[in-house]
């Protein structure tokens, strides 16, 4: 036990005091203790207590309660719009589905409750006046930057297969390594991830990929991750001899995720880019050939990768915007970019500035995970030049019908009949403007429309 002081939110402190004043023991527990000790701001404050669900309901009957977890001992109370989960100390029964206990047994012992938790860094509790309760070495593992299972790792993963991905997510989120015994048990149990619902797999993978240390975690634990995404296994050890690459396909993909610069991207853009980069070369093992010079070639891996990424993302039940956004980027991630204004304007017309900014971010990350050669540096300079000019033209150029100095009503006013011909004429005018053969000026456009 440590006498360190953790500053609790007023509402969490109030809940603890109410439970304790009624004769129950109660502590904040889990991630909020871990994050507080790391100097991070906890997102949630969970409470464990000797109080049974009926006792909690009676104590907080004047508050709004959520009772969906009551059979497992959890009562959530809503204070100032924020839920606080309070859970009775418990022992878990067997886990026949590798996800949920078949039954739970309520107990009065905090130590028994902490023993059932996943990792030592999540198995600490705290109460004012008592300090941090750390029975399984969580603090030393925080100091050593290690994710370690409580007790026997194989048992923890047999109880709940999703803990395998949780271990990787914590590795990526915190920049921690897996304890060797924990990593070995996770690898041995990776196939049990097939028993976990697609939605839960997606949520954990998404959290991993969006974490700051995702690249390093992917590089270290690809074989474990293949239990959730089997398609990555052929990428591990798939070599890329030649002047462009210094990594195999998997290590390259991991390095690209780590190299992503997400500044300026909105929430959806961040997610789309993380997943697109993760899967951008997923089909390379299927397309690999070796030329007479010994260099590896991957003809068609863009399109085939887009198809395979769509299968993976749909299987994981990813949101539609993510599926379409990531697949669209993968399909063209290795395609050359135009250097001339006409080509850039036409690309803006087809794809839009948001897509092209995402594409540049993916291309930068992809190239930064290549070999450090003059050829790669030249390609990166080409992307930078394209991005600069594209951003300029996105602000000042004309590449959509709405940006034309005339509209359909203007064309009908000069005698063009209503119908498909109006749209066709506008498209012709837009093409001429993008080609640079016609200025985007009202009189010039109207004159061209009647020719």
Region locations from a protein language model:
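Catalytic cores of the polymerase beta-like nucleotidyltransferase superfamily
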Residues: 1-451
């Amino acid at each position: 036990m440590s006498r360190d002081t953790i500053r609790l939110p007023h509402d969490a402190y109030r809940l603890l005091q109410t439970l304790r004043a009624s004769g129950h023991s109660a502590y904040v527990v889990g991630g909020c203790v871990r994050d507080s000790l790391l100097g991070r701001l906890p997102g949630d404050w969970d409470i464990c207590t000797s109080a049974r669900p009926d006792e909690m309901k009676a104590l907080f009957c004047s508050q709004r309660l959520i009772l969906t977890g009551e059979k497992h001992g959890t009562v959530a109370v809503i204070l100032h719009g924020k839920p606080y989960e309070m859970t009775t100390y418990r022992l878990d029964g067997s886990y026949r589905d590798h996800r949920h206990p078949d039954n739970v047994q309520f107990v009065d012992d905090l130590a028994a409750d902490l023993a059932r938790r996943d990792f030592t860094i999540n198995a600490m509790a705290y109460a004012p006046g008592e300090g941090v309760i750390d029975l399984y070495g969580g603090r030393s593992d925080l100091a050593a930057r290690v994710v370690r299972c409580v007790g026997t790792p194989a048992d923890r993963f047999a109880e709940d297969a999703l803990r395998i991905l949780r271990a990787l997510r914590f590795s990526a989120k915190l920049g921690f390594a897996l304890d060797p015994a924990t990593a070995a048990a996770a690898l041995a149990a990776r196939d049990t991830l097939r028993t976990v619902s697609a939605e839960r797999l997606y949520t954990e993978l998404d959290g991993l990929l969006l974490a700051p240390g995702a690249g390093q975690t992917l590089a270290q634990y690809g074989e474990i991750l293949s239990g959730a995404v089997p398609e990555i296994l052929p990428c591990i050890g798939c070599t890329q001899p030649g002047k462009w690459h210094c990594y195999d396909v998997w290590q390259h993909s991991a390095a690209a995720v780590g190299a992503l610069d997400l500044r300026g991207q909105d929430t959806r853009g961040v997610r789309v880019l993380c997943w697109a980069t993760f899967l951008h070369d997923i089909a390379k093992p299927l397309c690999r050939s070796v030329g007479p010079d010994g260099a590896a070639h991957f003809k068609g891996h863009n399109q085939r990768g887009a198809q395979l990424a769509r299968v993976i993302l749909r299987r994981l039940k990813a949101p539609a915007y993510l599926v379409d956004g990531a697949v669209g980027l993968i399909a063209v991630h290795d395609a050359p970019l135009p250097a001339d204004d006409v080509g850039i304007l036409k690309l803006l017309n087809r794809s839009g500035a948001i897509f092209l900014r995402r594409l540049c971010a993916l291309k930068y990350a992809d190239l930064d995970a290549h070999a450090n050669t003059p050829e790669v540096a030249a390609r990166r300079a080409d992307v930078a030049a394209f991005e600069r000019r594209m951003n300029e033209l996105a602000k000042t150029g004309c590449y959509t019908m709405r940006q034309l100095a005339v509209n359909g009503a203007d064309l009908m006013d000069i005698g063009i009949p209503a119908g498909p011909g109006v749209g066709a004429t506008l498209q012709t005018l837009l093409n001429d403007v993008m080609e640079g053969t016609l200025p985007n000026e009202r009189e010039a456009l109207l004159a061209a429309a009647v020719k």
